[in-house]
Amino acid sequence: MREKPEGGKGMAEHTPLMKQYFAAKAEYPDLLLFFRMGDFYELFHQDARKAARLLDITLTQRGSSGGAPIPMAGVPVHAYEGYLARLIALGESVAICEQIGDPGLAKGLVERKVVRIVTPGTITDEVLLEERRDTLLMALSRSKNCYGLAWADLAGGRFLVNEVNSEEALEAELARLEPAELLLPDEDAWPEYLQQRNGVRRRPPWLFDADSGRRKLLAFFKLHDLSGFGIENNPQATAAAGALLGYIEETQKQRLPHLTSITMETVGEAITMNAATRRHLELDTRVDGESRHTLLGVLDSTVTPMGGRLLRRWLHRPLRLREVVRQRHAAVGSMIDRDLDNKLMETFRRLGDMERILTRVALRSARPRDISTLRDSLSLLPRLRELLNASDSPRLRVLYAELGEHDSTASLLVKAVAEQPPLKLTDGGVIASEYDVELDELRKLSNNADQFLIDLETRERESSGISTLKVGYNRVHGYYIEISKGQADKAPVHYTRRQTLTNAERYITEELKAFEDKVLSARDRALVREKLLYEQLLDTVGAQLEPLKRCAAALSELDVLVCFAERAQTLDWVRPELEHTSCLHIEGGRHPVVEAVREQRFEPNDLDLHPERRMLVITGPNMGGKSTYMRQNALIVLLAYIGSYVPASRALIGPIDRIMTRIGAGDDLARGQSTFMLEMTETSYILHHATAQSLVLMDEIGRGTSTYDGLALADAVARHLAHINRCYTLFATHYFELTALADETYEGGLSGIANVHFDAVEHSERLVFMHTVKDGPANRSFGLQVAALAGLPAAAVAHARRRLAELEQRGRESHVSEITPLALDAPQQCSLFASAPSAAQEALVALHPDELTPKQALEALYRLKALL
């Protein structure tokens, strides 16, 4: 919505400054406008009110314009980045309107111009970025049967696209990538969960046109076709990429030389995990929103931020490309065998975030310490290449080549950049001495000023007889001679008063004025020269951008592989064996997170699944270890397929296309789904998508409804998974009746279902959980003992024991011991979809079998069949 001038007046009634403000604001009505005024960025009117609320800064007024007071809030220029970071974290976008030229030389109103737009998905400044997490901008396009996705990591120089054919797959990709900002065509019928996300930007639908997107991409990358990127026949991906690129160009207002290609990801390359699975497995965020005690928290020993970001990407996209994964395993093994990981890790400790530094070099926003960090990082390459030179690992040989030789660039930066440069170029002292003759001469002139001032102060004290006389300098008034008030009457007649203070007078002389002009001119010229030399360095480094980006990518991968090697040795993990045939055989498996955080020894457990044993029905007491066991096996599979070693004594793992979970309970209030509806929605997704190569975890299906409904649903789901989907399934249940599935046959053969259980023993009135998986079904649930452990009042537990005894007795008398006893005197829940009896049912009820002859019985059977 465009902001209108307040006060009910037209633009003609406003001051020139406010006219300038409203003109800039009209271009960016939906953004907060940082309007540069001297040493502050000011915000006015609605922007001021909003910023004051979000940043907890003072809301004030700046006179009036158009007959109304002007609400105003501001942040100092020297500290604006901290405020900007807070606004970006809240999902806000900011347009920065700078003063153009020197305000001191301007005649009348200073010219101002929006030079930069900062949005949650387009930030590249180090202070605004999370060090170990990608900041992604994403655009979505859609047709009837397809969604196109394009996303860019501007800070890392990556540009990727994908196409998916369902809303579920789209949601899975969003859960994986977690974009900071999402561009959508301004159309109806987008899913509600998309519209409720932070950072959603509605854009005109015509910007998402495939043909215009193709033209934009061809022009940007200077190509004749897109076949080299593999997206020539992907119109929705092309449309999304074009819309994304247009937004980036619109907000960045400059060339983007670090975006040099587009990568097409395909769903079939990776193991699919939907949003629920990522949430249940707590890969990098726990269900309660915390990031501690997650798989990433245990796994991540990377040294560099760019290695940490790559590890997070790998963790969320385990590959189905077994040869790629095997090469990672081999690289880790080679490092361990040759003790390379320790040597490489020690070297990596001196590496900087080259990936993001190179982006800032390309965007001309690199700061002096970025360049010194790049210099120090490049200087480490000879040592890294020496360590990798004799490696027998194919992947390490590739990475050795990708590192490249950058001796000339490193040598240039060593000569050109000061050992410890200042934070800002304008502070001076960035370029090293003896690099440029002209700069050295200007600095010499400036540096000699100190001795001149010492000599001048000594001479003036002697000639004036004022022992407390001082010669000094400040940025406002320049050089001065200061005399205390008590001795001001002794000031020589050739002193000209420059400034009066409370306790002193400051003067200037012709000699000091001449020196000031000479020195300040030299300093100004030195800064101008230094700026020119610095920009030349950026040009030189920028010319090597592509090989340097490949070097940074290789360093990132090496950091992750070193992390895997270190974790394998520290945590006693083993190299998994990836099989071509269907199997999931794990010996001595452990849960990586639980083992890391608990003080007691973790009890390892085995898992054995194959085509004749596809499902384990897992029974046992609550807190006995069922959920931990299921999750640990899923995490072991995931770790294996990102290239890591795994927490087990041996692991043979066949092809896996999906990891799917239905674990835990909790309402999804945002979508209006109850616990049971959420359970059924996730279960439905699994039944529709699981294949014979999928790993499925099902925890306590059916507990959200009545006992009979729950048992019936659990039975049906288990049979469907075992006989229709035929996937690897770990099925934890409190319905003991399901253990009978293992004894059934299916289509003349074994059911493919086996029983395992976790046990507990009562010892000295205490319940001890064994946490060991055993063959066969459990014989007790220990529900009351667990309730007592949880702190239920003793009276309540005692009452429950008496009630349980009564129900079990009634169950035995009624010969329905198969059904959960508690259901016997509970009212049964009616089905929402109960229907009237069918004609066949009514005919069957009317039959009296004892009164029928064999011929009549046969005729009745045919009539019933006809009614079905």
UniProtKB/Swiss-Prot annotation:
Key words, A-Z: ATP-binding, DNA damage, DNA repair, DNA-binding, Nucleotide-binding
Family matches, as SMART domains: MUTSac (SM00534), MUTSd (SM00533)
GO cellular component annotations of the record: cytosol
Record has DNA repair as a keyword: yes
SUPFAM superfamilies: DNA repair protein MutS, domain I, DNA repair protein MutS, domain II, DNA repair protein MutS, domain III, P-loop containing nucleoside triphosphate hydrolases
Database matches in InterPro entries: DNA_mismatch_repair_MutS, DNA_mismatch_repair_MutS-lik_N, DNA_mismatch_repair_MutS/MSH, DNA_mismatch_repair_MutS_C, DNA_mismatch_repair_MutS_clamp, DNA_mismatch_repair_MutS_core, DNA_mismatch_repair_MutS_N, DNA_mismatch_repair_MutS_sf
Pfam families referenced in this protein's UniProt entry, alphabetically: MutS_I, MutS_II, MutS_III, MutS_IV, MutS_V
NCBIfam families (UniProt xref): mutS1 (TIGR01070), PRK05399.1 (NF003810)
The protein's name in its UniProt record: DNA mismatch repair protein MutS
Lineage: Bacteria, Pseudomonadati, Pseudomonadota, Gammaproteobacteria, Lysobacterales
